[in-house]
């Protein structure tokens, strides 16, 4: 099955770099849970497509991608990854980070270990593969997980009474003063080119 990102390390490095930029310590197990959530929610949003070519297994600690785990076992690996991932995927990962990036390890364990995909694979034995279809079904049903719309919906700003408001980027506009009442306008009008003027 085709994946939309070249390798799972691209996504792992994205999370690691984002955590570093925000002075957030990213535990190796937390990285594993974020990768699992990223793959599962992406499959829901894109009709079963993979975000990254990754295989998750049901470890006793929680869902884990063994290649990423081995790669990060002694710190950040020195490998070449894509410097820039596609804009749509960057936006998706940003939404996911906003929702789960600052969550505690306990909360992420509760969410991921509570999915039927993890439970079914774990019941078959340690380190059993968690299929993408099982992950997608778990996240579609939103069992012990936030619904996909809660994860990727755009942020809505509200007033203190709870009414939604539309927020636009602020653009500084230079206002021209009321010409009839402006001292500056009168001053400029009274000066002619080349003559000395004193402000009243």
Q: Predicted segment positions?
A:
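Domain-edge interaction signal
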Residues: 1-200
């Amino acid at each position: 099955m085709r994946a939309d990102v070249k390798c799972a390390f691209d996504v792992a490095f994205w999370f690691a770099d984002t955590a570093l930029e925000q002075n957030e310590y990213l535990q190796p197990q937390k990285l594993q849970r974020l990768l699992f959530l990223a793959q599962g929610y992406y499959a829901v949003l894109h009709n079963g497509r993979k975000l990254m070519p990754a295989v998750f297994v049901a470890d006793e600690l929680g869902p884990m991608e063994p290649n990423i785990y081995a790669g990060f076992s002694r710190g950040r690996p020195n490998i070449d990854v894509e410097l820039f991932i596609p804009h749509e995927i960057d936006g998706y990962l940003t939404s996911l980070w906003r929702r789960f990036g600052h969550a505690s390890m306990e909360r992420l364990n509760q969410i991921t270990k509570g999915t039927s995909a993890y439970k079914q694979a774990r019941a078959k034995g340690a380190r059993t593969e968690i299929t993408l279809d099982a992950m997608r079904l778990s996240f579609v049903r939103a069992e012990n997980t936030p619904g996909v719309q809660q994860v990727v919906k755009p942020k809505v700003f509200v007033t203190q009474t709870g009414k939604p408001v539309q927020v636009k980027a602020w653009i500084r506009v230079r206002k021209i003063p009321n010409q009839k009442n402006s001292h500056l306008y009168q001053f400029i009008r009274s000066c002619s080119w080349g003559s000395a003027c004193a402000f009243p």
